[in-house]
Every structure is written in structure tokens, then in C-alpha cells.
Amino acid sequence: MQLDVLIPTYNRQEMLKLTLASLLAAEVPQGLSVRVTVVDNNSKDETRQVVEERKEAFDGRLDYLFEGQQGKSAALNAGIAATSGDLVGIIDDDEEVDAHWYARVHEAFSRGDVDFIGGPYVPRWGAERPPWFPMSYTGVIGWVDGGDQVVAYDKDFPGILMGGNCVITRETLRKVGTFATRYGRTDKHLLACEDEDMYRRLLSSGARGLYLPDLIIYHYVPPERLTRRYFRRWCFWRGVSLGMIDREHRAERVAYLAGVPRWLYGAAARGLFRRVAGALGREKDPAQSFAGELAAWDLAGFFYGRHFYRNGRSAGTGGD
């Protein structure tokens, strides 16, 4: 069984060192062959040197790949094209894998009844969690907890397969296509939803996926992401991305108003009421008050993405 681990990276040489150290330290079970590819997405720091200095420690199982087209999706697609293992694993450059990560991958795919897997993201805080942090918006900082049971990824799963801790068979990727480059973060915008788009295609194809609570990665949360400004920007641009997806794949059995699901208006209205109540001192929980404001940013982003935003990036192969 051959696993290719892809790490798309952009100007994070210090965190990349920790990511690579965790992969090197993790136990590789018998029967699993691992190769790691760092995809440098136009970094201006010493990313290449970091990789080159660690090749000997990886005993020839570490590769450097440069991808000049900006965006995580483009970097991932380059990594997929440059590798050939029957499994494609993806982690981010601000993460560390658990010591048993490889073992969990091997166990899952040895059964032969699964096409993709994902797992939890345990936060490693770079600063104290602020009192206004809303637990309904943990996705902003990449905090994922799908519970302590193995469950199927399907229409009833309360989330999606996140692209910073997942493994997909290469055969499945051949069927559903690679990542759509019109979505995903770049150096200019906090666009998102490359994961939502891929997850939608995986489910539509009939691929079988499992959430594994012990397929763990540890995700660093820097202080600059624990600000209200970052939360507002993230929610707006994620809304833009969801609006773009909806423009192409309108949801079924959902009531719309002015091209936007009606429930978004309701959520924003209730949220703004809580925000005003908080400003007047009637809402004592700062997290609830701020969550109310973020619901309005969700709506604003979705409306803009659905009707106005054109990012000008190529569509990529995914889903076209």
C-alpha cells in the first residue's frame, strides 16, 4: 500500500519544520510505504531549503515541488499529478500529525471497503481563547470535532470532509476529478469551499467515506486568527465561496428569496437582534452576541458571491 502525503505550503517555513518533524516521528506500520511531497505555492521564504535539509532524514522519501499558480487547490492538483501512490493524503503546513496517524490510515484502507477518510483537528492555541469566541464558528480556526465514534460521511453527517486531514484513494480522485481552482484561499482573499466542492462530488459519485476519531492532527491557531476582524473576514469570504457554489449547483428542496436560501435571512435577522441586544447589555454572553453578528456576515458574503463576485481564476478540472 503506497501513501503519498501532500503538504501545500505558502511562506510558513517555521511551521513546516514542525509538520515534517511530526511526519518523520510518526510510526509507519508494516505494509504501508510512505512518500511526502511538499508543494511550494510560490513562497518567498526559505521553504525549499527547509525541505532540502530534511531529505536525508526522510531517507529519500521527501520531495520538493514548486507550483507557481497561486492557491491551495492549484498546489494540491500539482501534487496529485506529480505522485503515483494508490492513496493520496493531505495535511496543511500548520499541522502536526498524531504519532499513530499512519497506522490509522493503514487500518482503514486494509479493509478494502472505504474510498476516503478524515478525522478531527485538535487546536494548539497560540494565544488564550477569547471570551467572545463562538463555539458555533469553530470552523473559522479549523477546529474540527466530529465526535468519538466512527461514522460514515453521508447526507446526515454534521459537517464535511476537511482537506487538511484526509486520505482519498487515487482511483476515487480519477473518478471525481481534482480540486476546483476557482475556490480556495489565495494570497489575496480568504476564499474557501474547495473542500465543500470536493465533498459534494465525492458523495455524488457514491464514494464511501468514514470519519475516524483517532485519525488526529494538531492544528496551530496563531494569535492573529483569534481576532474579531479575522472572524468577520473569514465568514464573509466563506459566504462568497458558498454563493459561488450555489450559483453552479443550486440546493434542492430549499426555499429561495432573491437567489439566497431564505433560512440565511432568518439566521441573519435573529443574529443581528442578538448583536443589538449585546450592545444594549441585554445579551450577557459575548460569544452569543458575536455569533449573531457573524450570521450577518455569512449572508452578506453569500449574496455577494451569488450575484456579483467573479474571481477570474480558471475553473480547474474539478467538477467541470
Give, region by region, the residue ranges found by the protein language model:
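Short, well-formed alpha-helical segments that are part of the catalytic scaffolds
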Residues: R12-A26
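A conserved acidic beta->alpha catalytic loop
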Residues: S22, D40-Q49, E95
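Glycine-rich, basic loop-to-helix element that forms the pyrophosphate-binding segment
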Residues: E67-T83
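Short aromatic/hydrophobic "clamp" motif used to bind/position activated sugar donors
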Residues: V88
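Conserved donor NDP-sugar-binding/catalytic core segment of glycosyltransferases
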Residues: H100-F133
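Short, flexible, basic/aromatic active-site loop/helix in glycosyltransferases
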Residues: S136-G159
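Acidic donor-binding loop at a coil-to-helix junction in glycosyltransferase catalytic cores
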Residues: L161, R185-M198
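Non-catalytic, C-terminal membrane-associated alpha-helical segments of glycosyltransferases
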Residues: R233-W237, R250-D320
